[in-house]
Regions:
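Active-site beta-alpha loop architecture of Rossmann-like, nucleotide-cofactor-dependent enzymes
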Residues: 37
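Glycine-rich phosphate-binding loop and adjoining beta1-alpha1-beta2 segment
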Residues: 1-27, 99, 103-110
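Structural motif
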Residues: 26-29, 78
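Structural recognition of the conserved hydrophobic beta-strand(s) that form the central parallel beta-sheet
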Residues: 31-33, 164
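Short glycine/serine/threonine-biased micro-segments
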Residues: 30-31, 151
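Class I S-adenosyl-L-methionine
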Residues: 20-21, 42-184
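Hydrophobic alpha-helix-in-membranes signature
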Residues: 33-34, 75
Length: 184
């Protein structure tokens, strides 16, 4: 295991370290998430209160692209990305940050380079806690990705966004949902 702060380590170092760790493995899972300060309600209100222009220019809005780069470079079979619930309401230049992240996660090579560069890489995205509230095209509603930990036996009321991505070329069927358990 390696704990790295994406955005602080150089991309070449991250790429080399992951390649070495994978040792040619074709089936693996990436678990992690970008820093949440730019998306958390507390962080946003503090920054917007100080200076809205400063908030709009905060480079932490784009740290999720470091995660995308790992997806594009290493093509994990499955990924699990976690972040704070405040991401659902975060906006940058009047655009939903969450919807942009979802679109980018579906096609990380395209998002990172503007082209697939011969890589046909795409992911199907899933909620692990809810299904069926999306539109006619079976696209999930952003709220579907919120996991309410207290509904799954965890003794705290912490709500998190969790996105499960399965590489399209290995996708067979939708994953099972978490089962609600008795509260602790």
């Amino acid at each position: 295991a390696w704990l790295a702060e994406l955005g602080m380590e150089g991309r070449d170092i991250v790429k080399e370290r992951i390649e070495k760790s994978l040792s040619g493995a074709k089936t693996w899972v990436l678990i992690g998430g970008p820093p949440c300060q730019a998306y958390s309600l507390v962080g946003r209100s503090r920054m917007i209160g100080e200076d809205k222009g400063k908030y709009e220019k905060d480079p932490r809005h784009f740290l999720y692209r470091e995660y995308l780069q790992i997806l594009a470079d290493h093509r994990p079979t499955v990924f699990v990305m976690e972040n704070v619930k405040g991401l659902l309401s975060a906006k940058l230049n009047q655009q939903s940050t969450f919807k942009k992240i979802l679109a980018d996660l579906q096609n990380p090579s395209l998002a990172m380079s503007g082209t697939t560069q011969g890589k046909n890489l795409s992911y199907k995205l899933f909620s692990i806690s809810r299904r069926g509230s999306g539109n006619l095209f079976n696209e999930p509603d952003p709220g579907d990705f919120v996991v309410r930990s207290e509904e799954y036996g965890i003794p705290q009321a912490r709500h998190r966004i969790i996105i499960l991505g399965i590489r399209s070329d290995v996708y067979v069927s939708d994953p099972d949902l978490l089962q609600i358990t008795q509260k602790v």
